[in-house]
């Protein structure tokens, strides 16, 4: 690798380090990929998990600035994941956005102190970006 390539690679690494990091948790592969690309285009670095258990491990191992999670997943629901994060000293202040389908509107209407925001699927890129920006200003 020549000096120009090294400089570009190092600049990319430094830029990624300055981006806020979102832990994305979604069991549907195509939805996860769509959300991952959407978040990256909004300027976020993304760590993706396919279920709540994987997300727990990633949250403990990586510094994260926000969590975007599906409500219904195998092994651990989005709300169970949120409660786990709120009970962890290091992670309790991380904003959590719960994504829910139309069929699960009850989850969004029930009071839950562990969730900062609810968005309905299919979520629009601008809606997600605006929600995360608002939560980051609050914290």
Regions flagged by a language model, labelled:
Residues 1-21, 124-139:
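Non-catalytic signal-transmission and effector/linker regions of two-component phosphorelay proteins
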Residues 26:
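Conserved acidic carboxylate
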Residues 33-41:
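Charged docking surfaces used in two-component/phosphorelay signaling
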Residues 43-50, 58:
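Short hydrophobic/Thr-rich beta-strand motif most characteristic of the beta2 strand and flanking loop
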Residues 62-68:
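Active-site beta3 strand of CheY-like receiver
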Residues 70, 100:
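Active-site residues of response regulator receiver
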Residues 73:
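Receiver (REC) domain active-site loop signature in two-component systems and cognate sites
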């Amino acid at each position: 690798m020549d000096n120009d390539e090294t400089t570009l690679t190092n600049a990319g690494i430094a830029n990624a380090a300055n981006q806020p990091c979102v832990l994305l948790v979604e069991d549907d592969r195509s939805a996860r990929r769509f959300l991952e690309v959407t978040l990256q285009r909004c300027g976020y670095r993304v760590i993706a998990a396919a279920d709540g258990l994987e997300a727990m491990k990633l949250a403990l191992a990586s510094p994260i600035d926000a969590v975007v999670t599906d409500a219904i997943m195998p092994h651990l629901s989005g709300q169970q994941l949120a409660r786990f994060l709120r009970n962890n000293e290091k992670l309790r202040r991380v904003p959590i956005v719960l994504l829910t389908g139309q069929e699960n509107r009850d989850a969004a209407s029930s009071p839950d102190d562990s969730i900062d925001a609810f968005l309905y699927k299919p979520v629009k890129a601008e809606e997600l970006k605006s929600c995360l920006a608002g939560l980051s200003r609050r914290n």
